[in-house]
From Swiss-Prot:
Location of the protein in the cell: Cytoplasm, Cytoskeleton; Nucleus; Postsynaptic density; Cell junction, Adherens junction
Region annotated Interaction with TGN38, chain positions: 595-816
Protein name: Neurabin-2
Gene behind this protein: Ppp1r9b
One GO cellular component, as annotated: growth cone
Stretches the record annotates as Disordered: 1-52, 64-163, 216-451
Region of interest called Interaction with ADRA2A, ADRA2B and ADRA2C, as start-end residue ranges on this chain: 169-255
Segments of skewed composition (Acidic residues): 410-425
Lineage: Eukaryota, Metazoa, Chordata, Craniata, Vertebrata
Assembly with partners or alone: Possibly exists as a homodimer, homotrimer or a homotetramer. Interacts with F-actin, PPP1CA, neurabin-1, TGN38 and D(2) dopamine receptor. Interacts with RGS1, RGS2, RGS4, RGS19 and ADRA1B, ADRA2A, ADRA2B, ADRA2C, CDKN2A, PPP1R2, RASGFR1 and TIAM1. Interacts (via C-terminus) with SPATA13 (via C-terminal tail). Interacts with DCLK2. Interacts with ADRA2B.
Zinc-finger keyword on record: no
Length: 817
């Protein structure tokens, strides 16, 4: 899985919850100035690491049920000699930073890590124990019975004056911690810090440390104070630390100091051999008593799994706090010799009360799981550094609930909270007091634990409406992928790009890298696969191959599918605004390698297809026929007959180790890897089957198409023969038409000649007609002239006749007469 880095101050906001203020409040406290970064954590371990505060708190619970072996003389001597000359020192243990939420918690590794850490912390808690220890029962009793037996074996403590002094000292430390608003893990002890440094170096929390500030701000710091605990029997229960503890401080008037009669107190504070340990001889002076600080441990919503689900309801919220006053001393049985009671052992009262209170609280909410017992060699080794009873381990920390808590990165939320300026979260502002426990009637004198009757503070919780984050429709896998992508985007260089989308598009192709959610792998994002030469992106030059598309026109492409991203790009128009993420120079990009492999694979497939097409072309040129099915079956599509599938290959360069030689954590990790490989292999097999089925269907379709093509070829041959006959007839018809055309052309030419001759004749006739008309006109004019002359002559003759007739008449008349 991809390892994520903490989010910077400018990252996108996460969803809100009622506990967000408290969740963000303790973030700054989790970052002391000397805290190592996540890169300084040990990377050689093959399995997951867990938070140092979780293991220390857990180991303190485990030490209450862990049997301490007989101390070696050399080890005990070294511890007693070392205590007087070492001065009280405060060591600040840095808490690891939050890591990915998708890292699964390995419970078997958690048990083993808890055991190894408890061995180291037992150096602060261990005390010399009697050589004879009761043997563990073959069948362990129930959780409540074991806890009650544990309480009954404890020895009550006296002397409240020194308790008040220790409480005053702890109160000063708490006030100092509130001033600098740091959530520290302060360990004050006599001796070297070698074991503690080693413990801090091995502690890295990917998941649980993110829950360490869920319910309180740094004002109301939470922790567990306890002193080196007494050695336990081998069969004592080892409790689980899957519990979020809450501590509130109330001041109570100091009780009257007990009567100094006491051989009892002296006998309780002596060692097993009846002599006082040498650590008691160097007790420093104590200040006058002040009001005592009472610690109360409140279990908040314990989630159980496995056997605990049958015993207690999961998610049970215990609202009532029980203030338990307990006095647990290191001695196992009181001795008979009496000596003056020293003041030094009295300083253990308050821390041991808290330890007993934590055990009493565990009766309600903690499952009955038992961690592996420590080996005798490890117990002897832990006894080599022995510390005085004044050595106080002050652990102020939170315990986590396990994996998949749904939290966010701590540093980013703290920075966002500082920017928003939200008021500090006060979880104890709405508390009420209810009557406490009633007085016990006739308590057993042998019982070493007593319960307080003080009022119980009940704190108000959030209502369902306030706590409802409305996440019913949220897909956990999609949210996880989005979270991983958001963390990955923070490591990229982000820059905006604006492109003008032309008629040919944006000129880029995208690819969605990452396996499916059913395999449990995160998605990697939407990347630029290719840049089209001459396109808009190529002309702009800022978008390159392997770039991550974070946003397009304000639409986030983080944690989306490739089809959704493609639809977003298709729906863009005009000027398109991109937010591009690019790997910083010098960083090794796995995504770039995957995209390069995909491009090479596609190029190789294209070359193979071109070769096959070229082979088909050669076969057609040589034989003029199509390749047969046998040729297709014999010709391999890919080298070795394997189909190339675009899936993620897991690293298989690890040597196969024998299960006997491997540790359980490595076996579990190897098993998870094999599960992932098996899931990937199954996906490949399913994809191969689907491809094979599709190829078989395509092959059948090709055969049907081939038969249809052969039938169509036969039909086309018949049609060609018919067309050839038609073509011959058409040719003969064309010849006849050609002859007729020639004849027609000859006739046309003859007619053309006749027409031209007729035209000449017509012209001649017209010319003659014109001449005839001219002659006729001339003759008519001559005729008219002759008629006029004849008419004139006729008139002259008529006149001459009339004249002659007159003359004749005259003659007759004259004759007659």
């Amino acid at each position: 899985m991809m390892k994520t880095e903490p989010r910077g101050p400018g990252g996108p906001l996460r969803s809100a919850s009622p506990h967000r203020s408290a969740y963000e409040a303790g973030i700054q406290a989790l970052k002391p100035p000397d805290a190592p970064g996540p890169d300084e954590a040990p990377k050689a371990a093959h399995h997951k690491k867990y938070g140092s505060n979780v293991h220390r708190i857990k180991s303190m619970f485990l030490q209450m049920g862990t049997t301490a072996g007989p101390p070696g003389e050399a080890g005990g001597g070294a511890g007693m000699a070392e205590a007087p000359r070492a001065s009280d020192r405060g060591v600040r243990l840095s808490l690891p930073r939050a890591s990915s939420l998708n890292e699964n918690v390995d419970h078997s590794a958690l048990l083993k890590l808890g055991t190894s850490v408890s061995e180291r912390v037992s150096r602060f808690d261990s005390k010399p124990a009697p050589s004879a220890q009761p043997a563990p029962p073959p069948h362990p009793p129930s959780r409540l019975q074991e806890t009650r037996k544990l309480f009954e074996r404890s020895v009550p403590a006296a002397s409240g004056g020194d308790k008040e002094a220790v409480a005053r000292r702890l109160l000063r430390q708490e006030r100092a911690g509130l001033q600098d608003r740091k959530l520290d893990v302060v360990v004050r002890f006599n001796g070297s810090t070698e074991a503690l440094d080693k413990l801090d170096a091995d502690a890295v929390s990917p998941t649980v440390s993110q829950l360490s500030a869920v319910f309180e701000k740094a004002d109301s710091r939470t922790g567990l104070h306890r002193a080196p605990g007494p050695p336990r029997a081998a069969g004592a229960p080892q409790v689980n630390s899957k519990l979020v503890t809450k501590r509130s401080r109330v001041f109570q008037p100091p009780p009257p100091p007990p009567a100094p009669s006491g051989d009892g107190a002296t006998e309780k504070e002596r060692g097993p051999g009846g002599q006082q340990p040498p650590q008691h001889r160097v007790a420093p002076a104590r200040p006058p008593p002040k009001p005592r600080e009472v610690r109360k441990i409140k279990p908040v919503e314990v989630e159980e799994s496995g056997e605990s689900e049958a015993e207690s309801a999961p998610g049970e919220v215990i609202q009532a706090e029980v203030t338990v006053h307990a006095a647990l001393e290191n001695g196992s049985t009181p001795a008979t010799t009496a000596s003056p009671a020293p003041e030094e052992p009295k300083a253990e009262a308050v821390p041991e009360e808290e330890a007993a209170a934590s055990v009493a609280t565990l009766e309600r909410g903690v499952d009955n799981g038992r961690a592996p017992d420590m080996a005798p060699e490890e117990v002897d080794e832990s006894k080599k550094e022995d510390f005085s009873e004044a050595d106080l381990v002050d652990v102020s920390a939170y315990s986590g609930l396990g994996e998949d808590s749904g939290g966010s990165a701590l540093e980013e939320d703290d920075e966002e909270d500082e920017e928003d300026g939200e008021p500090p979260y006060e979880p104890e502002s709405g508390c009420v007091e209810i009557p406490g426990l009633s007085e016990e009637e006739d308590p057993a004198p042998s019982r070493k634990i007593h319960f307080s009757t003080a009022p119980i503070q009940v704190f108000s919780t959030y209502s369902n409406e306030d706590y409802d984050r409305r996440n019913e429709d949220v897909d956990p896998m999609a949210a996880s992928a989005e979270y991983e992508l958001e963390k990955r985007v923070e490591r990229l260089e982000l820059f905006p790009v604006e492109l003008e989308k032309d008629s040919e598009g944006l000129g880029i192709s995208i690819i969605g890298m990452g396996a499916g959610a059913d395999m449990g792998l995160e998605k990697l994002g939407i990347f630029v696969k290719t840049v089209t030469e001459g396109g808009a992106a190529h002309r702009d030059g800022r978008i390159q191959v392997n770039d991550l598309l974070v946003e397009v026109d304000g639409t986030s492409l983080v944690g989306v599918t490739q089809s959704f991203a493609a639809s977003v790009l298709r729906n863009t128009k005009g000027r398109v605004r991109f937010m591009i993420g690019r790997e910083r120079p010098g960083e090794q990009s796995e995504v770039a390698q995957l995209i390069q492999q995909t491009l090479e694979q596609e190029r190789w497939q294209r070359e193979m297809m071109e070769q096959r097409y070229a082979q088909y072309g050669e076969d057609d040129e040589e034989t003029g026929e199509y390749a047969t099915d046998e040729d297709e079956e014999l010709s391999p599509t890919f080298p070795g007959g394997e189909m190339a599938i675009e899936v993620f290959e897991l690293a298989e360069n690890e040597d196969a180790l024998s299960p006997v030689e491997m540790e359980p954590e490595k076996l579990v990790h190897k098993f998870k890897e094999l599960q992932i490989k098996h899931a990937v292999t199954e996906a490949e097999i399913q994809q191969l089957k689907r491809k094979l089925q599709s190829l078989e269907q395509e092959k059948g379709r090709w055969r049907v198409e081939k038969a249809q093509l052969e039938q169509s070829v036969e039909e086309n041959k018949e049609r060609m023969e018919k067309l050839e006959g038609y073509w011959g007839e058409a040719q003969s018809l064309c010849q006849a038409v050609d002859e007729h055309l020639r004849e027609t052309q000859a006739q046309y030419q003859a007619l053309e000649r006749k027409y031209s001759k007729a035209k000449r004749l017509i012209k001649d006739y017209q010319q003659k007609e014109i001449e005839f008309l001219k002659k006729e006109t001339a003759q008519r004019r001559v005729l008219e002239e002759s008629e006029l002359a004849r008419k004139e002559e006729m008139d002259k003759l008529l006149d001459k006749i009339s004249e002659l007739e007159g003359n004749l008449q005259t003659l007759r008349n004259s004759n007659s007469t």
